């Protein structure tokens, strides 16, 4: 039946009992993808073995607008229409190569699709850098220049108005995604003002050299606290965390160190003049790591290792982070990133055609199941080989619910039966016999043992 087809996983899926997070990250901040495309991506990622999809709703561009966008900053309230309009203008100022924003109802549909597919969503809303559209809105609405030294994408973390506006903005999204049941929230925190400082130690070096790095640590910790208060785990990229081995910094008389509860997506060990702390050192400092090694990026509009096929995935190792092998206890997951640096370089259909098999190869590599002759069949509800959206009934997880049970006794096993509410498929689990629980009692000098459960 059609219902049974809906509950059958496609053949390319590979089940794993590991707790290792397998994340497919989509840069949907720089480039807008249609709602139907995102739903297909969710089905594709699930079929390819991923446990999570990370949606970059805010990364340079801001592609998701809530129904209520109103903000109150410094005692002044900005209407929902004013904020939404400013974000749209900011998106247009960032790029005219891609346009559009998802509505809240569309995002709700993404979560419904993810639930059907059996995959989780991790939001990414980058701050204090990579926030061109939000920075544009902050400056235009408040009448204050919120930029750090002329950066078009990074707020000044020493500017109170910039900080309060950005944090009020993020709080709305933290609340929304926590309400959808998300367990993680990535606020990025990478490449501070690297558009303004394009060589050497770049933006983080500028912060440190000017004595302002403490403001950055303070800001990052405040975002982490916001996320934790909402019941989620904070995530950030690695390069700004203890940059150049600077473990702490001060604002006035207060010294700040980074919150060790932040899970670090380690993507780069740096380059000439740009010296993030090593993955090994961050792990020894107590940070948990997600292997985000940049050599495995797919970057729209740039040459990368997946432009001509998927076999580069054979080089992946779950616990080898930017060339350094770490312990399984330090590395809690891996992430394959599809960045949209040049959003107009390809249409979404062209991109789907190019990423379909690398996405699958990397998912299988994270499961230790990659082979050069992997199954290349089309995923129902995912993408066709030409990049168009497949319209076959998509795979989804069974919605099993308890429908019958027999209690176990001391000597006889019990059982619990579960039935899928969608297709009727069922299975039964055995509950082992409990065994006698004898208690001793004195009876006129004799010791009598009686089972407290059945009386034997």
Model-derived regions, located:
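Active-site neighborhood of glycoside hydrolase catalytic domains
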Residues: 158-263, 267-287
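Aromatic- and acidic-residue-enriched carbohydrate-binding clefts of CAZyme catalytic domains
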Residues: 19-20, 60-116, 131-161, 178, ...
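Extracellular modular ligand-binding repeats in secreted and cell-surface proteins
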Residues: 392-456
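Sec-dependent signal peptide cleavage junction
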Residues: 8-17
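Catalytic domains of carbohydrate-active enzymes, especially glycoside hydrolases
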Residues: 37-61
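An active-site-proximal structural segment forming one wall of the substrate-binding cleft
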Residues: 48-50, 106-128, 152-186
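Flexible, acidic glycine-rich loops studded with aromatic residues
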Residues: 249-393
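Short, acidic/polar
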Residues: 31-45, 275-278
């Amino acid at each position: 039946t059609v219902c049974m087809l809906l509950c059958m996983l496609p053949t390319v899926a590979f089940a794993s009992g590991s707790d290792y997070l397998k994340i497919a990250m989509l840069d949907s901040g720089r480039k807008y993808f249609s709602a139907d495309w995102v739903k297909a991506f969710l089905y594709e990622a699930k079929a390819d073995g991923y446990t999570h999809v990370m949606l970059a709703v805010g990364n340079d561009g801001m592609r998701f607008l809530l129904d209520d966008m109103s903000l109150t900053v410094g005692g002044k309230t900005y209407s929902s229409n004013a904020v939404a309009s400013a974000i749209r203008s900011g998106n247009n100022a960032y790029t005219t190569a891609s346009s559009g924003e998802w509505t809240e109802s569309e995002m709700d549909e993404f979560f419904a699709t993810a639930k059907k597919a059996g995959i989780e969503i991790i939001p990414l809303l980058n701050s204090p850098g990579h926030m061109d559209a939000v920075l544009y809105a902050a400056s235009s609405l408040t009448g204050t220049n919120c930029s750090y030294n002329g950066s078009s994408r990074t707020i000044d973390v020493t500017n109170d108005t910039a900080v309060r506006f950005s944090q009020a903005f993020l709080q709305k999204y933290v609340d929304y995604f926590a309400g959808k049941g998300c367990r993680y929230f990535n606020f990025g925190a990478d490449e501070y003002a690297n558009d303004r400082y394009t060589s050497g130690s770049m933006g983080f070096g500028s912060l440190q050299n000017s004595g302002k790095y403490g403001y950055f640590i303070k800001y990052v910790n405040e975002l982490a606290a916001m996320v934790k208060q909402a019941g989620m785990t904070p995530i950030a990229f690695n390069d700004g965390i203890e940059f150049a081995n600077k473990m702490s910094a001060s604002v006035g008389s207060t010294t700040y160190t980074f919150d060790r509860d932040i899970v670090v997506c380690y993507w780069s060990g740096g380059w000439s003049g740009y010296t993030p702390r090593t993955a090994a050192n961050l792990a020894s400092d107590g940070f948990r790591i997600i292997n985000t090694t940049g050599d495995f990026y797919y970057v729209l509009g740039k040459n990368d290792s997946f432009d001509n096929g998927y076999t580069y995935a054979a080089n992946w190792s779950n616990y080898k982070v930017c060339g350094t092998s770490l312990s399984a206890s330090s590395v809690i997951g891996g992430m394959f990133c599809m960045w949209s640096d040049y959003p107009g370089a390809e249409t979404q259909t062209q991109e789907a055609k190019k990423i379909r098999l690398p996405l699958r190869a990397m998912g299988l590599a994270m499961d230790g199941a990659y082979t050069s002759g992997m199954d290349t069949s089309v995923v129902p509800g995912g993408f066709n080989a030409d990049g168009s959206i497949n319209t076959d009934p998509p795979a989804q997880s069974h919605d099993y619910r308890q429908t019958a049970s027999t209690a176990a006794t001391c000597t006889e096993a019990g059982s619990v039966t579960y039935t899928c509410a969608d297709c009727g498929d069922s299975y039964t689990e055995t509950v082992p016999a409990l065994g006698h629980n004898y208690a001793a009692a004195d009876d006129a000098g004799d010791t009598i043992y009686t089972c407290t459960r059945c009386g034997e």
